[in-house]
């Protein structure tokens, strides 16, 4: 199973990009993993929040196939431990789905259409983090989950 992270807007902070690149490099030995960065919406000052969410939602939906298992990284989602997340990924891999797609939305969240397409919602914390930080946290947690599943000594309970 391939794991894809879809994000809106590029990661501009150098140290975050470096961390993401490091975990992507580490993940290559475990699972096909990719990050698809969608362009920021232009002229957002002229748009309402709803218009911006709709425009971003259309971009996100255009990247998905009907066969994808879609997980939104959303503050209202289920919270899992690192071990729980590894079980979540293991179940996804065992399901026979070709691709599990995790999505980080734009600054205002997701459009109703994206929520409707989602198979599940996952939250990293009750706190709010920058979208860039979530990208780093996510790639690290996927790496951690893979080491847990392989019984490797990266994770400590």
Model-derived features: positions:
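N-terminal beta1-alpha1 ligand-phosphate binding loop
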Residues: 1-27
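Loop/turn-to-beta-strand initiation segments
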Residues: 2, 97-102
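Conserved RecA-like P-loop NTPase ATPase core
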Residues: 5, 71, 105, 138
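Conserved strand-to-helix beginnings and helix N-cap segments that scaffold or border functional pockets
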Residues: 17-20, 82-86, 115, 135
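S-adenosyl-L-methionine/SAH cofactor-binding core of RNA-modifying enzymes
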Residues: 32-34, 39-98
């Amino acid at each position: 199973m391939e794991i894809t992270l879809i994000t809106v807007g590029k990661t501009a902070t150098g140290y975050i990009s470096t961390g993401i690149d490091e975990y992507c490099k580490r993940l290559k030995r475990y699972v096909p993993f990719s990050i698809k960065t969608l362009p920021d919406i232009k002229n957002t000052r002229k748009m309402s929040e709803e218009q911006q969410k709709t425009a971003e939602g259309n971009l996100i939906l255009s990247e998905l196939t009907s066969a994808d298992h879609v997980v939104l990284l959303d503050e209202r989602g289920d919270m899992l431990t690192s071990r729980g997340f590894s079980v979540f990924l293991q179940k996804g891999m065992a399901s026979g789905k070709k691709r599990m797609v995790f999505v980080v939305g734009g600054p205002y969240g997701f459009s109703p259409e994206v929520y409707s397409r989602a198979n599940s919602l996952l939250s990293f914390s009750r706190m709010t983090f920058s979208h860039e930080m979530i990208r780093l946290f996510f790639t690290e947690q996927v790496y951690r989950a893979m080491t847990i599943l392989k019984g490797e000594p990266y994770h400590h309970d």
